[in-house]
Design a protein with these regions (language model features):
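Conserved alpha-helix/loop element of class I SAM-dependent methyltransferases that forms part
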Residues: 31-46
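A short glycine-rich, Lys/Arg-flanked "PGG" loop and its adjoining helix->strand segment in the class I
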Residues: 65, 131-146
Length: 209
């Protein structure tokens, strides 16, 4: 009997389709995304100024706003008009008076300086100009401040090239570690199994020297 050959791209697409179908029955995000642990890793406190880079729908922005309090400031960054509109609507709807929505670019989040921390949640793999973005974030952080990156883990054994992984919305953490170091960050923590279910996600904590 002739063996059936299945391409890696086909299998990956099938896995993504299965994941999309499974998403209909996923538990609420608050039960698995581990937002409190992400904030703990950032080591931020009330009254501080932090950035949510590629903030998306603003899921983590709400947690950051509560953490830094009314005397702190959260800069929620997005690029597309649609995402910026969604963030502004969230800020208005939830009365997040300590959140400022910023329109960034693919290479520059347009952040103010001397920030006490920054985070990129589930979006690092989407950044096509990651080195320029990391450099800009580093310059916006005060010395000693932390950048926390959380993203989807690549499916083991299917794709090794960075671009192939990113096109399937995942990334091997080794690429992020290398890129963070190239941008001048120090790696202070790496958790390859930060989240196991329903999605495999890693977390890297990097410090601006």
């Amino acid at each position: 009997m002739r063996a059936l050959r299945v391409s890696g791209h086909l299998v990956a697409n099938l896995l993504l389709a299965a994941a999309a179908a499974r998403a209909q029955s996923l538990p609420p995000r608050d039960q698995w995304q581990r937002a409190p642990s992400i904030l703990e890793a950032m080591k931020i406190a009330g009254g501080q100024r932090v950035a949510d880079v590629a903030a998306g729908s603003g899921y983590l922005t709400r947690f950051l706003a509560a953490k830094v309090g009314t005397t702190g400031r959260v800069f929620a960054v997005e690029v597309s008009d649609e995402a910026l509109g969604a963030l502004r609507e969230l800020v208005k709807h939830d009365s997040l008076t300590n959140v400022e929505v910023l329109a960034g670019t693919e290479t520059d989040p347009k952040l103010p300086g001397s920030l006490d921390g920054a985070v990129i949640l589930n979006s690092y793999h989407e950044m096509t100009q990651h080195q320029a973005m990391l450099q800009a974030i580093k310059l916006a952080l005060r010395p000693g401040a932390l950048l926390v990156v959380v993203d989807n883990a690549a499916i083991a054994g299917w794709f090794t090239a960075r671009d192939d992984q990113a096109s399937h919305h995942a990334l091997d953490p080794k690429y992020a570690v290398e890129e963070l170091r190239n941008a001048g960050f120090e790696i202070v923590d790496r958790q390859d199994a930060f989240i196991v279910e329903p999605y495999a996600q890693w977390m890297i904590v990097a410090r601006r020297p």
